[in-house]
Amino acid sequence: MEFPTQPKLVDVKTIIYPPGVKEITDKISNDEVVKRLKMVVKTFMDMDQDSEEEKQQYLPLALHLSSDFFLRNPNKDVRLLVACCLADIFRIYAPEAPYTSHDKLKEIFLFITRQLKGLEDTKSPQFNRYFYLLENLAWVKSYNICFELEDCNEIFIQLFKTLFSVINNSHNQKVQMHMLDLMSSITMEGDGVTQEQLDSILINLISAHKNLNKQAFDLAKVLLKRTAQTIEPCIANFFNQVLVLGKSSVSDLSEHVFDLIQELFAIDPHLLLSVMPQLEFKLKSNDGEERLAVVRLLAKLFGSKDSDLATQNRPLWQCFLGRFNDIHVPVRLESVKFASHCLMNHPDLAKDLTEFLKVRSHDPEEAIRHDVIVTIITAAKKDLFLVNDQLLGFVRERTLDKRWRVRKEAMMGLAQLYKKYCLHGEGGKDAAEKVSWIKDKLLHIYYQNSIDDKLLVEKIFAQQLVPHNLETEERMKCLYYLYASLDPNAVKALNEMWKCQNMLRSHVRELLDLHKQPTSEANTTAMFAKLMTVAKNLPDPGKAQDFVKKFNQVLGEDEKLRSQLEVLISPSCSCKQADVCVRDIARKVANPKQPTNPFLEMVKFLLERIAPVHIDSEAISALVKLMNKSIEGTADDEEEGVSPDSAIRAGLELLKVLSFTHPTSFHSDETYESLLQCLRMEDDKVAEAAIQIFRNTGHRIETDLPQIRSALIPILHQKAKRGTPHQAKQAVHCIHSIFSNKEVQLAQIFEPLSRSLNADVPEQLVTPLVSLGHISMLAPDQFASPMKSVVANFIVKDLLMNDRSNGDKNGKLWCPDEEVSPEVLAKGQAIKLLVRWLLGMKNNQSKSANSTLRLLSAMLVSEGDLTEQKRISKSDMSRLRLAAGAAIMKLAQEPCYHEIITPEQFQLCALVINDECYQVRQIFAQKLHKALVKLQLPLEYMAIFALCAKDPVKERRAHARQCLLKNISIRREYIKQNPVSNEKLLSLLPEYVVPYMIHLLAHDPDFTKPQDIDQLRDIKECLWFMLEVLMTKNENNSHAFMKKLCENIKQTRDAQAPDDPKANEKLFTVCDVALCVVYNKSAPCHSESSKDPVLPLTFFTQPDKDFSSKSYITDEARNLLLTGKPKPMTVLGMVNKPLNATGRRPYSRSTGSEISNNVSINSESDASVANRQSSEVPEIGVSENDENPVRLISVPPAKTETVKNKEVNLDQTAPSNTGTERGKKRSAASAGAENIRKESEEKKVDNISATPTPKPRRGRPPKSESQGSAAKNDETSKPSGRGRKRAAANQESSGAQEAANAKVPKQDSTAKKTAQRQIDLHR
């Protein structure tokens, strides 16, 4: 430091020095000055305030020490000693200082402040004097004298800055306390704290300074705590200036306000009492970035561990929660991130956060939905009970998010929770129970179409649900109890996963086999097709194709790599071998110079899918031992939350599934001995599964394990003769599959069973019929002829054509399986036996198939009561109708029988999908879809789904639509992958279903008046149900192709009745409606189809170009069909809402947009309704046949009549102009009505002639007699339409069932586009 030339000292003659101290002048050396000053310091140090004489004596000396000679002395030791003297002088002369000049006082205190910088070096020899100086100043509060100075603020700021700059970690507690005392006295005893002074304190809280000097931060923190009451108004003023008034110039710290608020809140929330309302104001700022900064700040304040801000300041908390819905994406994102800390530190606030996180879990921004999951999972990982079930439910929902990143995060998060709390048992049983649903949910995701989802589920299964790195026994125990605790859908998904992995293994095996063959064009084509198949099973199939080709090239060049891959996919590969092979193959494919190698990633995906990391011979053996322990009662079943019986049954089911995918792993004495033990158990399901395992895995039993063979044969014989039907089936197939002398074995079963058939004991018939049916199917050459006499003499004449018992007359349309009468069970199996016998023969030389089809048709026409003796119950009739329909469909899968099925028989079969019984419709639709999706049924059977538009139950219609989507997709994909001839294209191209559909609808028994607008509307709905799915995309100009199909039909006649004008008129009318729909859907469809469609000759005659060119629907009808003008509500367009009054209530038909919103349109005038009663069929929610309900509404006539009259009114059917009708069945009346003879109907027609007769619809509920009677338990049904079942009134159904099973009108709410398409059609 440089000082100006030293001024002259004051007159030294008047100065009295302490004894022994010579004069201090500028003539002496610095060392001498220091020596003499030390003695002066000692003198002042020993003086106290009471020494008045000495105070007066040394007053000149005190004034002398304040001269410029001392204050500006260049020697730091001199300055230190002078500062000590001055500090003592202020102590001695307190409360009055000997210096009267304000300028001098300011100069002195600035001088003393500068000397305090010496405190920085604690190792300095002078440190004790510096400490003495600080202690003296703090104890006496010497700086308080400065309050009288006008510009004291400069002194204080300098002091504060000095102290904060010198403090460091080498100072002891005393130094810090004296500094604190010094600054707090100035802060608390002054008139206020200036902004500059406040800045000198607050600057130490800024991160940059805080990191440089932690002690200064701690000192500032303690100072603020001590002076909180005094300094709070100054802090409030500062933040008010910056936050509210926007005066950033008031302080250099303005840009750090939010950091300061955070630090101040952590120090003492009371410092910010007046600031928090200002933050609420800032939260509502129009500036998004400003809101973001405030949200970040408040997130830290609310989320910090010990914060009670949310409780203390509810308005601010509520305002902050509102930012979860901020329009600015970063603000919402920040709010969501905060939630994690809040959940972990403040579980009591979870309830407040839940609703906001729910909304954000559906945020349009992917990043926000992703962070909601991260937030919840992070908290749950710390402690599961920090998150409630609702929050976990949000994560569960996001596993189906449209974005892969979000789905992946949700799935992985749930998997980690499951592993932590269920597998590792952290958190105890309560925690495991809380997340026990996760395993099912994760496996359900395997049903999704995305290959990425499937692969992630496989990865999660291998790493989280059943970790593959566990020891074999532990791994199998984990799998054993997991399988036993899964729900049925999860079990199916897991089975499908193993099936897909096994299928991919077989594809890779076939690819390796192609490598062994000599190169040829055929080989190259086959290899390319196989590579494409493999690529479909990998992520991003487009890119995967290139990688698979590259991998195939590497395989061709590297024989060792091929051999390793062969080991990996060989049936005998162990889990440990698989692990080694995967590592070796990945190492060979890897490129060390390429850190991110997408090719390597793809290869790993492939290897992970095909590697048997869970199951090998050792694993199967461990599973069998676990099951044996369960059988013996020594397992941990109860501890694992599974009953022993459930564990055994699930264990057998698991082994059964694995027997399909890993059959060679079962081949051991120990395994088969255990399975024999299971065969002897009383549990039917266990024995059935055991037989199937033998069937799948026992091909080498006869040669390698003779003792097992000897024990197995008598058991299989016994099961085939006296086991359950399922056991009998599996036993016959097992014998056929694993024994070389199967003809002898099957004959030993066939002969005694065929001789012992007795229709009078139906309870003992089912198993023999099952066994005989399967034997005749598996060995037709040996048993077809003997079976013919059994069929003719027993099955048809004795069993099917006779009713030996009276059915239950409770009126129910369906009953549980266990309540079905033995006779009907036997008849059902007899029908299946007929089908199996024919399927085994695969020819119609004996015309047996024609006879069988006539029999099945007769059963459908008679509605299940083949004898028409009315002894059979309603539910049994439903079972037999279903059996007959399914049998025709099964025979149609065999080409030789499909050719002889007549159009009439096909139509009868189709009408089963509109049966009055819900379960018949449901099961028939499932069987139809299952056969179609495997491409086993001819294309015309897909047209049957068009009739589902008439189904009164929304779920059935939705299921049918999904089936159509799947079938059409599969057919189109098959055509793309497999080039087919034009002839085969007729049976595969989905668009070719249109002519079949048109013909089927033209022969719909409900379609009796081609010009009736209501009937035309129903036809249009059925057409649209199919065409909507077909016309979603105009692939290959398919719209023009379908238009051409319809036009070509109008150039033909109906092959079923070529000379019947009425039949042809109906056909052409349906054609015109179809054209109307196609034109409306594809307005720009002006181009002509390049293909000339070929029509099936079974249904249409040869084209005649000049035959029919006129339009069969009027312009008015066309307009009504397209505009969707309101009409009486039908099941297709109304909400299931019960009437409040017993009188008729009119409904209007919904437009497409209204349908999509589930809105029903009410009311037309009663007068207009009277003219439309014939087509009104209100659909209300209640049980249709107990289990799956469709409520019927009674709609009585306008006049009060007896109940009987109302029944007659409801039983009026459409005019009987349907041709040769046999066994007519009238629409079922409302529950509780008795059968009324035709004569009584005719007598009462006059009583109701004023009211048009309502036309009941097949598969949908007609109007019942009254609302009250709709709740009754029995029902009646009357003949009315050929081969036709119309929906009957409902029977017994509890209120709970009614509510739970309420149905809504047909609609397609899955996408807005669908709704828009419906709107287009109605315009």
UniProtKB/Swiss-Prot annotation:
Keywords from the named record: Cell cycle, Cell division, Mitosis, Nucleus, Repeat
Composition skew (Basic and acidic residues), residue ranges: 1235-1246
UniProt KW Cell cycle keyword: yes
Residues annotated as transmembrane: none
Any GO CC annotation of this UniProt entry: chromatin
Subcellular location: Nucleus
Composition skew (Low complexity), residue ranges: 1153-1165
Region (Disordered): 1138-1323
UniProt HEAT repeat ranges: 385-421
Biased composition (Polar residues): 1166-1176, 1210-1220
CDD domains in the cross-refs: PDS5
Gene Ontology BP terms: cell division; DNA repair; mitotic sister chromatid cohesion; negative regulation of DNA replication
Location (main, coarse): nucleus
Role description: May regulate sister chromatid cohesion during mitosis and couple it to DNA replication.
Entry-linked PANTHER family: ANDROGEN INDUCED INHIBITOR OF PROLIFERATION AS3 / PDS5-RELATED (PTHR12663), SISTER CHROMATID COHESION PROTEIN PDS5 HOMOLOG A (PTHR12663:SF2)
Binding partners and assembly: Interacts with the cohesin complex. Binds chromatin in a cohesin-dependent manner.
Remaining remarks: Chromosomes assembled in the absence of pds5a and aprin/pds5b proteins have a mild defect in centromere cohesion in vitro.
Record-given protein name: Sister chromatid cohesion protein PDS5 homolog A-B
Organism of provenance: Xenopus laevis (African clawed frog)
Record gene name: pds5a-b
